[in-house]
């Protein structure tokens, strides 16, 4: 196996540094998505030149074991032959038509087959577009205005969902981004994740005005925090009782943690469990701009052109993106795929935990399928305030030590990590060895 570089390039000769300097003159912050700027951890972002399998190479020619996987989509690894072949064939047939294609129908059929809660599905181009459209759909289908979200859950950057929790119970939201007028989020209730009593109180106060409850079943922007089974069960019960729609945001977890998504994991403990609407993204595009939302036929038929809820997109169902997504979904259905992926991911988390504990460093981790997270804490957190107690300075040092060893984790404390089918036992071993060196010498 080719070994990663372990000697950082001096800033004076680094192409990464030169590219970042050029980028900052033209692109706000030098990046096109804030987390890529390394602002949380410090240092110079790596500008990626190419990727293959479980690795990518930066502008200085250094190779890294990749645990961000384009923030989730690359479940097969980079450049999987079946996906590359499908995309090459699609490109030769045309980039975009602005008209329906057979592959749109085929991708919809695959999604409906694999996710039992989805009877109809609409394809869009990003996770933000999916969740934004879901909010409009839920309000249109119910005739209600209020929505519930949870502190620490990220549902994209649409105005109504960029909300932080205020103090006290079920506080009406205030924006967490400049440029979002307060009146836009006045109908957004923000509750504490995994807090059943607060959830019950919110429905008691506002139940008949709530259009939907939106939740990340595994919150990947709190690093990796699971909603407890009793909490999800109560979410379902209260939504049913008050005729509100239960929305699972599975943009990150869909097809990443299990073939049927996180909802299939909860259905193992809650008989008959289904959300009303599901938002999907990342894996269904295989690395191309692709997302979707789907649910019961009764709800989805409120969408135009059947109903009065308008949603549209020039590139929705793009023929190249659907080819990439279809090829990916067909690969992950092969026998044993998720068993092997889950075992490899668990071995990584177990190895990191052992390395830290041997050095007396508080550390805990969790995983499901090919998604994982870890905290510099003694016990797994259950909500955002607990996540905030993790040791940020130590994480930043850990991040840079691993980066210098050729291991690329998310450059932020609150982001989940991802393992692909291309990661090998040797990759995991090299990663754990690098972590062991850091913890022993901290």
Swiss-Prot record:
It comes from Polaromonas naphthalenivorans (strain CJ2). It comes from the Bacteria. Belongs to the class-III pyridoxal-phosphate-dependent aminotransferase family. HemL subfamily. Homodimer. InterPro entries: 4pyrrol_synth_GluAld_NH2Trfase, Aminotrans_3, PyrdxlP-dep_Trfase, PyrdxlP-dep_Trfase_major, PyrdxlP-dep_Trfase_small. Its main location: cytoplasm. Keywords: Cytoplasm, Isomerase, Porphyrin biosynthesis, Pyridoxal phosphate. One of its GO terms (molecular function) is transaminase activity. It is found in: Cytoplasm. This is Glutamate-1-semialdehyde 2,1-aminomutase. It catalyses: (S)-4-amino-5-oxopentanoate = 5-aminolevulinate. HAMAP family: HemL_aminotrans_3. Coiled coil: none annotated. The gene is hemL. Pathway: Porphyrin-containing compound metabolism; protoporphyrin-IX biosynthesis; 5-aminolevulinate from L-glutamyl-tRNA(Glu): step 2/2. Transmembrane segments: none annotated. GO terms for biological process: protoporphyrinogen IX biosynthetic process. Its EC number is 5.4.3.8.
């Amino acid at each position: 196996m080719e070994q990663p570089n372990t000697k950082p390039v001096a800033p004076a000769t680094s192409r990464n540094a030169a590219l970042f300097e050029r980028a900052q003159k033209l692109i706000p912050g030098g990046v096109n998505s804030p987390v890529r700027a390394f602002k949380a951890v410090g240092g110079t972002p790596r500008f990626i030149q190419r990727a293959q399998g479980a690795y990518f190479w930066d502008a200085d020619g250094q190779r890294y074991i990749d645990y961000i996987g384009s923030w989730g989509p690359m479940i097969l690894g980079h450049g999987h032959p079946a996906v590359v072949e499908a995309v090459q064939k699609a490109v030769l047939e045309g980039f975009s038509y602005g008209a329906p294609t057979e592959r749109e129908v085929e991708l919809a059929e695959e999604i409906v087959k694999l996710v039992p809660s989805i009877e109809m599905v609409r394809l869009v181009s990003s996770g933000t577009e999916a969740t934004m459209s879901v909010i409009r759909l839920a309000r249109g289908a119910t005739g209600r205005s209020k929505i519930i979200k949870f502190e620490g859950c990220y549902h994209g950057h649409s105005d109504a969902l960029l909300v932080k929790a205020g103090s006290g119970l079920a506080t009406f939201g205030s924006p967490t981004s400049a440029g979002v007028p307060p009146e836009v989020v006045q109908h957004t209730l923000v509750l504490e994740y995994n807090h059943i009593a607060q959830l019950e109180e919110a429905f008691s106060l506002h139940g008949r005005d709530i259009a939907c409850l939106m939740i990340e079943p595994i919150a990947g922007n709190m690093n990796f925090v699971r909603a407890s089974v009793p909490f999800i069960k109560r979410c379902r019960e209260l939504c049913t009782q008050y005729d509100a729609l239960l929305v699972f945001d599975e943009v990150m977890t869909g097809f990443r943690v299990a073939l049927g998504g996180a909802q299939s994991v909860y259905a193992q403990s809650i008989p008959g469990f289904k959300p009303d609407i599901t938002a999907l993204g990342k894996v269904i595009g295989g690395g191309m701009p692709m997302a979707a939302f789907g649910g019961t036929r009764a709800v989805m038929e409120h969408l135009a052109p059947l109903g009065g809820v308008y949603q549209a997109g020039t590139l929705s169902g793009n023929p190249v993106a659907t080819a990439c997504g279809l090829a990916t979904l067909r690969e992950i259905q092969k026998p044993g795929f998720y068993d092997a992926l889950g075992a490899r991911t668990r071995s990584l988390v177990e190895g990191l935990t052992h390395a830290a504990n041997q050095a007396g460093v508080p550390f805990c981790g969790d995983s499901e399928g090919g998604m994982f997270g870890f905290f510099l804490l003694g016990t797994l957190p259950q909500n955002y305030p607990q996540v905030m107690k993790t040791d940020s300075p130590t994480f930043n040092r850990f991040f840079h030590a691993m980066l210098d060893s050729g291991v690329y984790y998310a450059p932020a404390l609150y982001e989940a990590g991802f393992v692909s089918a291309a990661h090998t036992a040797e990759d995991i071993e090299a990663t754990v060895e690098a972590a062991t060196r850091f913890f022993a010498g901290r």
